[in-house]
């Protein structure tokens, strides 16, 4: 998945780090540390040397309770810093909620507009429409001055996800390309500690929307409460751990104060893999309840997937019922796709999957024939192989409706490790037509 930011293009399947450069006197964790021009430039270049791909320049504090500053004051802090960094060949993001400031900084060379207000201002949308900068669309309930005044949600994950989906769709309707948009659920912005924690533990719901997504938890107050760390400067290690967790759930951009600590944590990021599950023989089912029996067997297999060492299920698709493919004289199938993070190598993973199939009575007599449970590796991150034991990506993914639909449900626009888009075969040309249950 690429994030297009003016002349910069980032493949965010492997997370990248955006270094935070606050040129303010009053930011919550580093206000005043880099608010002279020379200090700001030096710190930005240091973060680039440490491995940051983007520098996010902010000239207005958005900490809870902060007062708005004038655009003139904001630009006096930011625009020359943006200009010098951009001229040095650095990808610069401007962290602003003011259209006039965004326009001036884009003209000075900024390649990204990071708007904590989520492009609610029509003037900001017009700035975005008139340039080719990448956009960070954030969720914030209320305004910085009042956002922490008892925020209430019926379901914080659903409300934030749906808000971001709506804002992204509106931006696309305004003429902004899909691949310019990055979504940020806004941890700590109009959310208390427990709400933010719930949101971060369900980050895959944001990733499901099919856009690049950002985790911006660095030194946030919820980390202080969750880990018992009062001083924001002491939260870098915990922040990096939270960022790693979000990246395992699908985040592709990490906004961080401490670039070195963050990249150190991201070394532990496990590859993702997609598994396809299918069943059309129910071992135990009353007449008329065969579908429920098939679902029960797939659920049992998913339970066993949870037991594979150094692995974690990230997401599971809905169940789909599909027509038989290739060998037609058999019962309909129930299918699903599972997204996992795993430290287990593909060949070893295949052995675990065969053991799960065998435990559920899998008999391999007829090619593409009836089965109690089938668990296939569909795609394994950055891994392409074709030998007698294993072929990856699975060679028939794109022609199988019963794989394409559940996979795209959890990972819209997914591109396989060999560069093939999952949706490359039109639906009317696929086999095994599938319907969501």
Predicted regions: what they are:
Residues 271-311, 317-321:
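N-terminal beta1-alpha1 ligand-phosphate binding loop
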Residues 61-66, 314-341:
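Short, charge-patterned binding micro-sites
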Residues 5, 29-38, 42-43, 62-84, ...:
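Active-site-adjacent loop and "lid" segments of alpha/beta metabolic enzymes
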Residues 1-14, 45, 270-272:
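SAM-dependent methyltransferases
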Residues 48-49, 90, 167-180:
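Phosphate/pyrophosphate-binding loops at sites that engage ATP/ADP/AMP, CoA/4′-phosphopantetheine
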Residues 325-333, 350, 354-437:
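Flexible, gly/pro- and Lys/Arg-enriched active-site loops
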Residues 42-58, 249-250:
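Catalytic domains of carbohydrate-active enzymes, especially glycoside hydrolases
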């Amino acid at each position: 998945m690429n994030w297009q930011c003016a002349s910069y293009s980032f493949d965010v399947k492997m997370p990248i780090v955006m270094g935070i450069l606050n040129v303010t006197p009053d930011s919550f964790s580093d206000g005043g540390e880099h608010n002279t021009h020379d200090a700001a430039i030096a710190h930005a270049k240091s973060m680039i040397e440490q491995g940051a791909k983007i520098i996010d320049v902010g000239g207005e504090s958005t900490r809870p309770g902060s007062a708005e500053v004038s655009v003139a004051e904001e630009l006096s802090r930011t625009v020359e810093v943006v200009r010098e960094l951009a001229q040095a060949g650095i990808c610069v993001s401007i962290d602003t909620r003011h259209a006039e400031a965004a326009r001036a900084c884009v003209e000075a060379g900024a390649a990204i507009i990071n708007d904590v207000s989520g492009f609610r201002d029509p003037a900001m949308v017009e700035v975005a429409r008139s340039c080719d900068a990448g956009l960070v669309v954030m969720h914030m309930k209320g305004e910085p001055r009042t956002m922490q005044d008892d925020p209430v949600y019926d379901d914080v994950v659903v409300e934030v996800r749906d808000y971001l989906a709506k804002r992204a769709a509106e931006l696309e309707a305004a003429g902004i390309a899909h691949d310019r948009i990055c979504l940020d659920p806004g941890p700590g912005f109009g959310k208390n500690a427990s709400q933010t924690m719930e949101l971060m533990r369900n980050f895959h719901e944001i990733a499901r929307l099919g856009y690049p997504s950002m985790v911006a938890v660095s030194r946030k107050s919820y980390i202080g409460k969750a880990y018992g760390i009062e001083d924001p400067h002491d939260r870098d290690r915990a922040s990096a751990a939270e960022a790693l967790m979000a990246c395992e759930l699908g985040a592709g951009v990490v906004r961080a104060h401490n670039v070195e600590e963050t990249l150190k944590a991201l070394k532990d990021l496990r590859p993702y893999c997609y598994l396809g599950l299918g069943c059309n023989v129910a071992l135990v089912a009353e007449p008329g309840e065969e579908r429920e029996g098939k679902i029960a067997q797939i659920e049992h297999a998913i339970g066993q997937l949870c037991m594979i060492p150094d692995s974690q299920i990230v997401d599971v698709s809905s169940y789909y019922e599909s027509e038989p493919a290739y060998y037609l004289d058999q019962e309909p199938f129930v299918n699903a796709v599972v997204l996992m993070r795993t430290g287990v190598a593909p060949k070893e993973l295949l052995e675990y999957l065969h053991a799960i199939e065998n435990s559920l009575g899998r008999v391999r007599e007829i090619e593409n024939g009836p089965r109690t449970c089938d668990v296939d590796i569909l795609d394994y991150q950055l891994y392409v192989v074709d030998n007698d034991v294993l072929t990856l990506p699975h060679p028939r993914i794109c022609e199988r409706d019963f794989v394409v639909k559940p996979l795209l449900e959890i990972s819209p626009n997914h591109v396989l490790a060999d560069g093939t888009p999952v949706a490359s075969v039109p639906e009317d040309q696929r086999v095994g037509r599938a319907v969501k249950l």
